[in-house]
């Protein structure tokens, strides 16, 4: 009995988080996926899966989802790596400014970004206005509701994830390696391909995995910017559950989506190890995953060098091309950063238009669309979103801090299985989590409740907060506590004067991450509210399905300014850290 209590005390830090995930994540997801293979009336059955695979409209939608997700992933990596490399090379204020320009669209709502592209790509939008100004030809029509619009919206929304996943890996690479390769006779391109690119491969692969998993579960961008031919699996699942109440087909589609994502995740884990996904890839053993990674790096290096010799080197002999390439090394990433940062700004002037439609240029000046937000419906949705986001941040922080301490102090073999369980919600598409919670909450009376929203949003936010808190705990030097104890400080004083001040900036960043994730979350709200209540994203979604009006631009501008303030606050807190903390 004493041994049991000792084990419980030793693992007390991780127990609450695992118990929460077991109840609010693993059980709902496993239950809802099992419905695709089993029903109380028929028992085990593959009818729903066969119908999904053999019905042309469903199988085509599945293949289209994979195609759009793959294209999105490739374009995010091709654009995100140069941006991350440029940020890595910069120093001082320039690096901070560029980092903020990438961070701001990351924390901007997907709905806001989609509405921005409605303004830009519409028939009377800014892009058509620019084309008319440059060519003098009248607009040929809307640039919306096609594959190009969907890809633009998805790449714009997900490229910041790729940048911020690759950047820590680049920062961890010793900057002396490339000059060392040059001193041994390697050309700049050769040093890049044979040294830098293979070392950055784990970060590139992690970014690809995160972008692909998120893309597979996307429904906002295809619904707002795409047409019927751009319908994705998540859109089909939403229609089947909320409109048709066809649970067998919905869960069969979800199961196929889960199988694809699980296969990608297993391939990543086999190649790079789970810890590389949370920024601890350097702890790989020199057997198994590490040897496989070394082999893949060599093969990747060989293929890159063959492509360089067969394509880029012959092009380099063309006049002026080397000069253009040198300038594109910084100009291209800067243009991509502007592509990420500027679209949301177009919503600001549109929110002050006199016109009742979204067009460009807007007809100034009116506050009527902001006044339209001052209604009980919008106020209630905003208040519910703020309170749910605050509770999500507090609950996530309360569970992840002790779990992060436990993970950092455990041996690698002990922590790896637990780490896989804890970050699982980051890998499973949100639409699957949402229908799982909907199925569970409908049976225990939490549909439409404030608590149901908090629990659902916490499931989504936990992996991201955990990764942040692991970095915070790793950076904390416990010798400072020991030094304070030697100087006679009691436990309460050490906690108040040493531990909390040093952990507070990182904890605040983690809280803001959970807060913003909750504030932007639509998928969970779409199911868990059950039409009985509304959050701000769901209210905006319902309005957009009825009519896209400048009211949405006003709401989007308000959210955008609020998110911008949160980003600037987090950056200000980060810059005010003490010198002692920066060195820990």
Q: What are these model-predicted stretches?
A:
Residues 167-182, 187-188, 470-480:
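Membrane-helix/interface signature in polytopic inner-membrane proteins
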Residues 5-41, 54-171, 195-219, 226, ...:
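Membrane-water interface segments at the C-terminal ends of transmembrane alpha-helices
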Residues 184-186, 198, 487-489, 501:
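Glycine/proline-centered hinge or cleavage motifs at structural transition points of membrane proteins
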Residues 224, 233-259:
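Membrane-core helix-loop-helix motifs of multi-pass transport proteins
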Residues 41-54, 129, 229-242, 361-372, ...:
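Short hydrophobic, aromatic-rich alpha-helical segments embedded in or entering the lipid bilayer
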Residues 180-181, 191, 237, 483-484, ...:
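Hydrophobic positions on the alpha-helical face of helix-turn-helix-like DNA-binding modules
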